[in-house]
Swiss-Prot record:
<protein>
    <recommendedName>
        <fullName>Small ribosomal subunit protein uS4</fullName>
    </recommendedName>
</protein>
<dbReference type="InterPro" id="IPR002942">
    <property type="entry name" value="S4_RNA-bd"/>
</dbReference>
<dbReference type="InterPro" id="IPR022801">
    <property type="entry name" value="Ribosomal_uS4"/>
</dbReference>
<dbReference type="GO" id="GO:0015935">
    <property type="term" value="C:small ribosomal subunit"/>
</dbReference>
<dbReference type="GO" id="GO:0003735">
    <property type="term" value="F:structural constituent of ribosome"/>
</dbReference>
<dbReference type="InterPro" id="IPR018079">
    <property type="entry name" value="Ribosomal_uS4_CS"/>
</dbReference>
<keyword id="KW-0694">RNA-binding</keyword>
<comment type="subunit">
    <text>Part of the 30S ribosomal subunit. Contacts protein S5. The interaction surface between S4 and S5 is involved in control of translational fidelity.</text>
</comment>
<dbReference type="GO" id="GO:0006412">
    <property type="term" value="P:translation"/>
</dbReference>
<feature type="domain" description="S4 RNA-binding">
    <location>
        <begin position="93"/>
        <end position="156"/>
    </location>
</feature>
<dbReference type="GO" id="GO:0019843">
    <property type="term" value="F:rRNA binding"/>
</dbReference>
<keyword id="KW-0699">rRNA-binding</keyword>
<comment type="function">
    <text>With S5 and S12 plays an important role in translational accuracy.</text>
</comment>
<dbReference type="InterPro" id="IPR005709">
    <property type="entry name" value="Ribosomal_uS4_bac-type"/>
</dbReference>
<comment type="function">
    <text>One of the primary rRNA binding proteins, it binds directly to 16S rRNA where it nucleates assembly of the body of the 30S subunit.</text>
</comment>
<dbReference type="Pfam" id="PF00163">
    <property type="entry name" value="Ribosomal_S4"/>
</dbReference>
<dbReference type="Pfam" id="PF01479">
    <property type="entry name" value="S4"/>
</dbReference>
Length: 204
């Protein structure tokens, strides 16, 4: 797990942004790429380069593979409405994303771990699939046996992130009601995610 966290922060520096908005992100004090020549700074990117970085941001932020992100995009593209909004709505509807965005855990990695270890229920039923799609009206809750886990207690105490309006969180019950599928503009990303460039990347 430590190795995963280290790679996470390395990705933040590689992409040139404090991706998760965390105060302890090394990018806050070392805002240059990792590696031997990192101190030389970030290179100016081509149009494709900017698109590629934007798609990498989404991969890292939501902890999904290239294949997973592409599949989500294809579904968003085929759906009526704005493709960027559809993409973000689908990613934010993932169970791990709901747990993370609600502030019940400190990171997306810990959200995936909490779900995978059967510590989360949806409408009273245990769901251990991080990619499970939550629907408006669903109630997501951390099980009592996990309520005293250090990562849960730390997240509730710190309240490090602003909870988006599409989630109704009860910190005492460690539960969250999913009110609606959000659009890109509804999600308080700590970094500039440029979903339009992700759409261009996959549409090119």
């Amino acid at each position: 797990m430590v190795a995963v966290v280290n790679r996470k922060y390395r990705a933040s520096r590689r992409l040139g942004v404090n991706l998760w908005g965390r105060s302890k992100d090394p990018f806050n004090t070392r805002n240059y790429p990792p590696g031997q020549h990192g101190a030389m700074g970030y290179k100016k990117l081509s149009s494709f380069g900017r698109q590629f970085v934007a798609h990498q941001k989404f991969k890292c932020y939501y902890v999904v593979s290239s294949r997973q992100l592409r599949n989500v995009f294809l579904k968003a593209y085929r759906k009526k409405g704005d493709t960027g909004d559809n993409l973000v709505g689908a990613l934010e509807s993932r169970l791990a994303s709901v747990v993370y965005s609600a502030g019940l855990v400190p990171t997306m990695f810990s959200a995936r771990q909490l779900v995978s270890h059967k510590h989360v229920t949806v409408n009273g039923r245990v769901v251990n699939i991080p990619s499970f799609s939550v629907k408006p009206g669903d109630i997501v809750e951390v099980r009592k046996r996990a309520s005293q886990l250090p990562m849960v207690l730390a997240a509730i105490q710190s309240q490090e992130r602003r909870v988006p309006d599409h989630l109704d969180v009860n910190t005492e019950k460690l539960s969250v009601k999913y009110l609606a599928v959000p659009k890109y503009s509804d999600v308080p990303y700590p970094a500039n995610m440029e979903v339009n460039l992700v759409v261009e990347f996959y549409s090119g």
